[in-house]
Amino acid sequence: MKRTFAALLALLLTLAGCGSQPAADGRTVLRLDADGSAVLSDAVRLFNAASADYRVVMDTEAPDIVAGGAGYESSNLVDIMPYVDSGMGREDILPFLLDGLEEDGALYALPVRWGGMSYGCSKELLDGRLTLSEAEALELLDGLGEGALLFPGWANDVPWQLNAYQPEYDRETELEAYYSLPSLLERVNISSVEQLAAMVTDGALWDTGCPGIGPETDCLTLSILASCGDVEGAWEFLSFVYGPDSRPAIELGDGCLLPAGAEQLYARLAEQEGVDEAALELARAYVDGMSLRDAA
């Protein structure tokens, strides 16, 4: 009987350690698996300073909220579309993000920021185009002359690299020669409002993405697990990170820094030097042509 009671007590203690629970200060604790994101760590600090009812702690073992949501079936996540509709409204989420994440009318991950590395082409060569088809790219590439590259790249698993093991091989010289070849596309980062503003004003490169595909991007998302004991509180945190109050934390990070909300994005863009109505329209055309990388 004593063993049975001890086992039951251990089970109850284990269950008590999972999911949302009261903190010593009376606030409900919500657990976040931030997937190693320093940006979200700073957002947690700001949220905890602002919230009187909830406190978020980082916990990978028994989370209520997860970043990314990879590895979780939709049946294990909360459909947050009703919360979106009664909150910021689905029309505020940038269409390409909503389209890429929506599943049969349900939304299991809220996009909070987006951006990333892409490929850009000279605005002069593009001559007003926003994207490049494969045929257009090949035509422009031919005009750059013999030996021109579509874009400079480097790989460690292709046969020609085997000469790196030859005594006479001079990697530095070969790399210098390789990267001095003319190329149609160059690496370009569009991951912050400042970088987007530069591109639509006086930037030399325009993000076309890969020819025939167009510009693609990554995004940072937050999901609520179905096992969460306080979905309302978890949604309060998601809304905080999505909204402008998390800006001081988000803008200190790297990677996905562009707001997922249209109102916030274009308001921030309009604050940048040199961005007029024409530049804003150009930015809208660019964002409307974006797609979410690896979207299901």
Predicted segments with their positions:
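Conserved N-terminal structural module of periplasmic/extracytoplasmic solute-binding proteins
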Residues: 1, 13-70
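Hinge/lid segment of periplasmic solute-binding proteins
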Residues: 69-118
